[in-house]
């Protein structure tokens, strides 16, 4: 009877090994699930960035407001009849 119990436990162990550690085992499934969640997070961030870029491209194609804003802030341009005034920041200690 003792050998039968040991034999059955060994058989159960041999049957469980591929389930947990084998090629399609639970450990692999959990690892793939973790990788999938990470990739979904990366994809979500990229979709948000792409939506912002898409909105900016549409804005640049349709109107001059975005172009004017970029010219003013990034290139320091002013309109023809405007006067540019720059006020220097106060230096601490003076």
UniProtKB/Swiss-Prot annotation:
Keywords: Cell cycle, Cell division, Cell inner membrane, Cell membrane, Coiled coil, Membrane, Transmembrane, Transmembrane helix. Residues 31-73 form a coiled coil. It is a single-pass type II membrane protein. The chain crosses the membrane at residues 4-21. GO terms for cellular component: cell division site; cell septum; plasma membrane. Residues 1-3 are cytoplasmic. The keyword Calcium does not apply. Residues 22-94 are periplasmic. GO terms for biological process: FtsZ-dependent cytokinesis. InterPro entries: Cell_div_FtsB, FtsL/DivIC. It is found in: Cell inner membrane. It comes from the Bacteria. Belongs to the FtsB family. Part of a complex composed of FtsB, FtsL and FtsQ. Essential cell division protein. May link together the upstream cell division proteins, which are predominantly cytoplasmic, with the downstream cell division proteins, which are predominantly periplasmic. NCBIfam families: PRK00888.1 (NF002058). This is Cell division protein FtsB.
């Amino acid at each position: 009877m003792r050998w039968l119990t040991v034999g059955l436990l060994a058989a159960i162990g041999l049957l469980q090994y591929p389930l947990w550690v084998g090629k399609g085992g639970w450990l692999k499934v959990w690892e793939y699930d973790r990788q999938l969640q990470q990739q979904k997070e990366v994809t979500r961030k990229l979709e948000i960035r792409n939506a912002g870029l898409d909105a900016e491209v549409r804005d640049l194609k349709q109107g001059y407001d975005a172009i004017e804003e970029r010219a003013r802030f990034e290139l320091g341009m002013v309109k023809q009849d405007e006067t540019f005034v720059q006020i220097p920041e106060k230096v601490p200690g003076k």
